[in-house]
Amino acid sequence: MGCGGSSGASDPSSEKINWNNAEIHDEFKQEQKKAGAKRKAFDKTTGKAVEKERTAADREFDFFEGADAGSGEQFMAVRPYEGAIVEPAQHNEPSKDAPDVTYDLEYVYGYRAEDSRMNCFYNKNGNVCYFTAALGVVLDQDKNTQKFFGGGQTDNTSKMVARDDMYHTNDITAMDMSNCRTLCATGQNGSVPVAFVWDAATGAKKGRYKLDKGGREVTAIAIDPKKKYVAICANDNDHQLYIFDIDKGTQVKKDKSGPDRIFHMAWSLKDGDSVVATAGEKHFAIWNLGADSFKKKKGIYGDKGKPTSHSCVCWDDAGNAYSGGANSSIYVWSGQNLTSTYDVHGKGFVGAIRWCDGKIISGGKDGQIIISNPADGKAEKTIDVGELVRSVDMKGGKIVAGLRNGTILEIDSKGTKKEIMKSHSDGEAWGLAVADKDTFVTSGDDNKIYVWDLKNRKSTALAEICNEDKNSKAGGASSLTEYAPSKCGRSVAVNVGGNGNVAVGHNDGRVTIRGGVKSIDKVTKTLTDSGEWIECMAYSPDGSMLAVGSHDNNIYIYSSADYSKLGTLKAHNSFIVSLDWSSDGTYIRSVCGAHELLFFTVEDFKQDPSGATNTVETTWHTNSAKYGWLVSGIFPAGTDGTHINHVDFSSSGSLIVTADDYGLVNVWRNPARAGATPVSLRGHSEHVVRTYFTQGESYILSIGGYDKTIMQWKKK
């Protein structure tokens, strides 16, 4: 395999490519179709899915859309819950001061693999750097501890006005590691995207770089070998390529790359070169920063290989580029000219590629990581990982791989595989329940239920939500997942006071009962009364009953002994978003999508119209209702009832934690009355859908919907 010139024309414009005959694998086409397609967003007032443009310039309200009838001034005028707000007989003295507590981000469970690539690397110390949500993560895989770029205490503001001068405030979408493994670069989405360069060992910020308005997101980013420049590609209509001086923070060059999306980019490793290559949809090109004009030079295929899309690219020390083709082949380039191709993957597409120690290491749709010698195009080592490979890196005989299923895998020189990170990986993740002081359970739209060990910071069990494909009886949860509604779960509950069962609410309306956290894979009962998907569930304090809140507007009550249905609570005019049991198990209060706060007597399953007054002396086993006298001050100024997604009280009753649409976890004094100030914590990039104190309030747990990330906040 030589590196001679292409037999194609020397002028790129003279090569006419018929893209209808290009060799692009069908599954790669499907991925790109999904990336550009309209997505479903959840209207939190109607509870229905609505279509939105997936590449909206600003995603402030992307996945939770407020309906006109229930938001803004109309909401403020109507407030249907207001008549149910009564001051409780016993409460703490109100204070507007922020609570005198500090919660630090200790650990996050997440890795963005759904739509990103080449985003997981070794740093100089051998630790693994990657990203999830709005965080850059440095994982010490031996100690299982993490450091972060971003995250921590922040102002209680919308993302539209949140400060983005110090860290990311929205989804990180692209990453690179410098060739010397000391710097990381990350870029985020938003109407005016920003990117950062930060220390790969400590997470300390080194520089910030702002793109033009309308950039939508950073799709690719790369640090040059000398650590002088960072190249950044936007997802605007022209897919502009920017070059910034890392130390000065100034823009050096900018040019339009064309109409097609750029997936990845890399700088030449050859001494003296200042050349960057871009790989994308129907696109391979090089850009020479040292040339008289900074202009794109399209790849020339000639007769050396079939045109295709390219998902990733790397360079060797001699100045040859290697791109991962959408047809399973690796393309070898000298400058803009294709010199040869070789195929070691055989099928699918090449999803990741890296030049390490004189070899090409690549990963593909075929679920294989392959070390190959580009000189002869032969595979020297093949490792089967059984999943689409999104990212590969190699250092000191070890390989780290990011997989599409949300797993980060480390492989030693003997081929031994170790999962160093597991995460939810498709659609959204909503389900979160605390089982005991060290154990919690999560579920998502990826057909996964996880049991987690908080103290040891790892997953202890994983089970499928369902093994059959079933659609919803009516309606349906909004999601980008490719899994059937039966395989998606938005709600989990643990019977802490009783038999230890775990209930999982599916998006097709069914509820499955699992034996417990140690037998999460064993379904002992299936409940099918609900007509739509399940958003909330709770066991009674003594564990004798299970309440299931459905999007068919009803609450179903079951005996936890045999899960026979005891009754149905019917009074709400919209889907159920939260429910709480009284400590004695005699009352249930619930909130729905129409902002109603209602009370029911469990004995006769009837609504108590005077429930607010009749329960002023009542203590509540849980406090998830976002409307009430004790939580009247939790809504940010100018927002409506849809902006708070979950509420929990600490076991001592002194603190309140809320999850909001701005990606914030907020800690308040109890009560949180008008004018109260929270301690606000940022780390999530999208709407936080659930948050809980652990027993003794030593930790706060939170889960982000679209970012699919679980965060563990430790009290200092």
From Swiss-Prot:
InterPro entries with a match to the protein in the record: Beta-prop_EML-like_2nd (IPR055442), Beta-prop_EML_1st (IPR055439), HELP (IPR005108), Quinoprotein_ADH-like_sf (IPR011047), WD40/YVTN_repeat-like_dom_sf (IPR015943), WD40_repeat_dom_sf (IPR036322), WD40_rpt (IPR001680), WD_repeat_EMAP (IPR050630)
Renumbered ranges of WD repeats: 167-208, 213-254, 257-297, 305-343, 345-382, 424-462, 529-568, 571-610, 639-678, 683-715
Protein family per UniProt: Belongs to the WD repeat EMAP family.
GO molecular function: microtubule binding
Pfam family, one: Beta-prop_EML_2
Comp. bias (Polar residues): 8-21
Annotated segments matching region Disordered: 1-53
Basic and acidic residues bias: start-end ranges: 23-53
Tree of life domain: Eukaryota
Protein name: Ciliary WD repeat-containing protein ctxp80
Keywords recorded for this protein, A-Z: Repeat, WD repeat
